[in-house]
């Protein structure tokens, strides 16, 4: 994964969480070292990709999909459309292809939404 491998946090200091972890003091306050989580595989759902793996997400899919992809050793992206390299506007790309190892085309994805369910009266 990419990003910060570890960070110091005050959360958990003085609790069971802190046992066995590195403890340091900064400006008179204690912090514990937390190592980042790295996933083996990150599965993301994107609207569109180019053949280089650059991805465009729609709406709230922009929230956690890029983070999931960058935190994983391998990212597999399911996309609705694959276009040629250069067809995506660079300003529209949410995740660079450097983080994507596989692209799977699903042009007609099942749209899972909540459905109204009513109790049948006997």
List PLM regions with ranges.
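Conserved alpha/beta enzyme-core scaffold
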Residues: 1-122
């Amino acid at each position: 994964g990419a990003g910060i491998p570890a960070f110091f946090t005050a959360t958990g200091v003085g609790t069971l969480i802190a046992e066995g972890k590195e403890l340091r003091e900064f400006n008179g306050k204690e912090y514990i070292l937390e190592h980042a989580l790295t996933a083996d595989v990150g599965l993301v759902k994107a609207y569109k990709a180019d053949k280089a793996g650059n991805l465009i997400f729609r709406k709230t899919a922009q929230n956690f999909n890029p983070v999931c992809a960058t935190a994983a050793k391998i990212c597999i992206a399911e996309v609705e459309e694959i276009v040629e390299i250069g067809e995506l506007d660079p300003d529209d790309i949410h995740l660079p292809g450097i983080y994507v190892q596989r692209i799977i085309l699903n042009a007609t994805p099942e749209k899972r939404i909540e459905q109204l369910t009513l109790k049948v009266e006997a």
